[in-house]
């Protein structure tokens, strides 16, 4: 090597040395190595490293966060199960399962399987503490304590006293639809049913909670911004919920809250009604108890559990969980049934043949229409109230899957209702199709065979969850939906404004459907208003 070459080599080595000792470059090199180690060590040491799924999903929760933010998690989950089978690794420590037979084990009634942290971010920060509600409390023992004081009010008997409240709002809903969307000569201007389903659900839950409508039906638009606020809160919960540690720096930030928009207007309204109820200033009818009456009763009977913050948490969960699930279900029922004229005409005929004795239709009479129940259950099968996975941590002892493989303690597993409800082993080869008849006994089907099939479908139904964490409001929501669908069809003729138009669905905490434009016409012989006290707006 001549002198020139030696000089070049020495120069290159000196340049490398200078780069290596440069503090900024050294910092970034160390940072890069640290990041690689941060992701790669858990990846190679994970007890579920052999499970199949997207590579990025096995490295970071941000993969799920990305799809959650885009509103397509249900479609992504379904596609991945079609590719990888019944077990898919969708996060570093999470397995998504398409095993309906494991629902009763993992979503148990004994509280052994603990909820994962993403459920907990809906807790509310009060001072230096976080108040968890009946949904967000992950500890099974604490959840049972919160649930016990109010459980009886949500039994089928308990919610029956709320039927007059639903009747009042339903009668007003019918009046508003008739005033704005019908004409004497026939069908009126298009009704944006996706929006009005939300308005109706908001007014119904407000009326049932504190005996006053929220005002959305009256104003015919999102006058206080709460429909939009609720949507953005739900977007935050499912997006940040995929990486729960972020919530400590956002919504639970001790210095400056950067979290989602709050339910302050609803909380203020609830507090005002609570104050007036206690002082005797409000004029609600005690013979028609509402949920606020129930919660005050629980406060008297369980003072060690139900203080004022806890009572407020019950009210806010009423609103957060009781509005969107109902609106989602109503949209799905009308859209799916109207898209299939055979189904719609059969449903319409059975409702009109029922000869209801009064309007709004009573819950007991609505439940007596077999095809109505079939349409409602089929709509909720395809579009359950939540299309995000219901997750639990595997308890001590682990979990053996039907294929014989083992999932160790501490790994999170879950079931996405959108996926489970399309499992062909349960619902048949046409599981992706809307066919209400699957809930009815076939002409050539034996009673025993139908009972077995129905039992399997019921045990696989996650429309309201399962086990000890099953939606507490299932009986109220069911009553509301049955009465509403039966009454609306008994009063109006419906048609799609544009039969060729497809709806759009954004999957947040609850599916948000849009683009459901309908035309309605009042049926001959029906008088509107329906002759009820139409209630009051707060």
Curated annotation (Swiss-Prot):
| GO CC terms, sorted | membrane
The EC number(s) given in the record are 1.-.-.-
- As recorded in UniProt, coiled-coil segments are none
Location in the cell reads: Membrane
Cofactor(s) in the UniProt record? heme
Where heme binds, per the record, is at 471
Which InterPro entries does the record match to this protein? Cyt_P450, Cyt_P450_CS, Cyt_P450_E_grp-IV, Cyt_P450_sf, Cytochrome_P450_monoxygenase
Instruction: List, alphabetically, the Gene3D superfamilies matched.
Output: Cytochrome P450 (1.10.630.10)
Q: Which UniProt keywords apply?
A: Flavonoid biosynthesis, Heme, Iron, Membrane, Metal-binding, Monooxygenase, Oxidoreductase, Transmembrane, Transmembrane helix
> Membrane topology for this entry?
Single-pass membrane protein
Q: Which Gene Ontology molecular-function terms are recorded?
A: heme binding; iron ion binding; monooxygenase activity; oxidoreductase activity, acting on paired donors, with incorporation or reduction of molecular oxygen
Q: Name one Pfam family in it.
A: p450
Query: Null phenotype?
Result: Impairs the hydroxylation of the flavonoid skeleton at position C2'.
Specify the pathway.
Secondary metabolite biosynthesis; flavonoid biosynthesis
EC supergroup of this enzyme: oxidoreductase
UniProt key word Protease: no
Annotated GO biological process: flavonoid biosynthetic process
- What residue intervals traverse the membrane? 24-44
Per the similarity annotation, which family is this? Belongs to the cytochrome P450 family.
* PANTHER family listed in its UniProt record: CYTOCHROME P450, P450, PUTATIVE (EUROFUNG)-RELATED
Per the entry, what this protein does is: Cytochrome P450 monooxygenase; part of the gene cluster that mediates the biosynthesis of chlorflavonin, a fungal flavonoid with acetolactate synthase inhibitory activity. Within the pathway, cfoH is responsible for the hydroxylation of the flavonoid skeleton at position C2'. The pathway begins with the PKS-NRPS hybrid synthetase cfoA that uses benzoic acid or p-hydroxybenzoic acid as a starter unit with four rounds of chain elongation using malonyl-CoA to form the chalcone skeleton.
Tell me what this protein is called.
Cytochrome P450 monooxygenase cfoH
Task: State the gene name recorded for this protein.
Answer: cfoH
